[in-house]
Swiss-Prot record:
Transmembrane domains' residue ranges: none
Protein name, per record: Shikimate kinase, chloroplastic
Role of this protein: Catalyzes the specific phosphorylation of the 3-hydroxyl group of shikimic acid using ATP as a cosubstrate.
List of residues binding substrate: D136, R161, G183
Record flagged with keyword Amino-acid biosynthesis: yes
BP-aspect Gene Ontology terms: amino acid biosynthetic process; aromatic amino acid family biosynthetic process; chorismate biosynthetic process
Entry EC no(s): 2.7.1.71
Species lineage: Eukaryota, Viridiplantae, Streptophyta, Embryophyta, Tracheophyta
Record's cofactor remark: Binds 1 Mg(2+) ion per subunit.
Class in the EC hierarchy, top level: transferase
InterPro entries referenced in this protein's UniProt entry, alphabetically: P-loop_NTPase, Shikimate/glucono_kinase, Shikimate_kinase/TSH1, Shikimate_kinase_CS
A single Gene Ontology CC term: chloroplast
Assigned keywords, A-Z: Amino-acid biosynthesis, Aromatic amino acid biosynthesis, ATP-binding, Chloroplast, Kinase, Magnesium, Metal-binding, Nucleotide-binding, Plastid, Transferase, Transit peptide
UniProt subcellular location: Plastid, Chloroplast
């Protein structure tokens, strides 16, 4: 698929999967490069016209295309996730089992802001030999490198959501991708139509743990977390609770659910101490369970 654009102002960039995401704080280093399969590069192009009040919700014309490239470097080599040799081996073995059922279908991670979609997505892509893309980063790149928060402020949420849908549509035409979606991508039925072409996984994190993480990292990059007077944790938790009440049923549309509360119970540890590797393993397990169930239903 090729991207072609022809308007007065054009932005066209080749984006590799390690360039469209922010580097995570932790590192997972694999001793071997297993599942070395063709990666993807995505072209995101857009045309920007001077803003007019009457057309403030106009979409950027995104063109996303992908072509296989033999990229030898691991997308995780620049990160730093702590994982034992046993954890890495377990992830490797489970990924090999799941691949048989996945058959190249894309995996979409959904969930509230701050739930770990990007971090887990990068590890998941590495284990499966997939390419990883973050919808928010693709949109930011397409509109000239401004942040999601700035897009919300300058163009409004509707403008952002329209382009989010366009990105999901383009990605849904591809294969062997792990996609991290925005927290609000689930509210539009058309987005589910695109994501259901692959496998969707809901990362379900207790709101208290989310609020703690987000307030620690800061809320400036979160456009839907309005600055309010009072304790930052309390106001963040209140806003997250409101968002969850609105989106909860939408998240439940996912093919599989990964509950960090359940992981914590099984491993007898606090939710906040669950590692990205442990979450990724549970994602693989839940994907496998879903696909096995789906296969058995088809056979019947």
């Amino acid at each position: 698929m090729e991207a072609r654009v022809s308007q007065s102002l054009q932005l066209s960039s080749w984006i590799n999967s390690d360039k469209v995401v922010r580097k995570p704080s932790g590192l997972l280093r694999f001793s071997e490069k297993w599942n070395e399969k063709p990666r993807h590069r995505v072209v995101v192009s857009c045309h920007l016209q001077p803003r007019k009040a009457a057309h403030s919700d106009r979409r950027v014309q995104l063109k996303v295309s992908c072509s296989p490239q033999n990229v030898q470097a691991s997308v995780l080599e620049s990160g730093c996730f702590s994982a034992s040799i046993d954890e890495i081996e377990t992830l490797k073995n489970k990924a090999e089992e799941v691949e048989e059922y996945l058959d190249g279908r894309c995996v979409y991670l959904v969930g509230m802001m701050g739930c770990g979609k990007t971090t887990v997505g990068r590890i998941l892509a590495e284990t499966l030999g997939y390419s990883f893309f973050d919808c928010d980063r693709l949109i930011e790149q397409a509109v000239g490198g401004i942040t999601v928060a700035e897009i919300f402020e300058l163009r409004g949420e509707s403008f952002f959501r329209d382009n989010e849908t366009e990105v999901l549509h383009k990605l849904s035409l591809m294969h062997r991708l792990v996609v991290s979606t925005g927290g609000g991508a689930v509210v539009r039925p058309i987005n589910w139509r695109h994501m259901h072409k692959g496998i969707s996984v809901w990362l379900d994190v207790p709101l208290e743990a989310l609020a703690k993480r987000i307030t620690t990292e800061g809320t400036k990059s979160r456009p839907l977390l309005h600055e309010e007077s009072g304790d930052v944790y309390d106001t963040t938790l209140k806003r997250l609770t409101t968002l969850m009440e609105t989106r909860g049923e939408n998240y439940a549309n996912a093919s599989a659910r990964v509950s960090l509360e359940n992981i914590a119970l099984k491993r007898e540890k606090d939710v906040c101490h669950i590692t990205p590797a442990e979450i990724t393993l549970e994602v693989l397990i839940q994907i496998e369970n879903f696909l096995k169930t789906q296969k058995s239903v088809v056979v019947l």
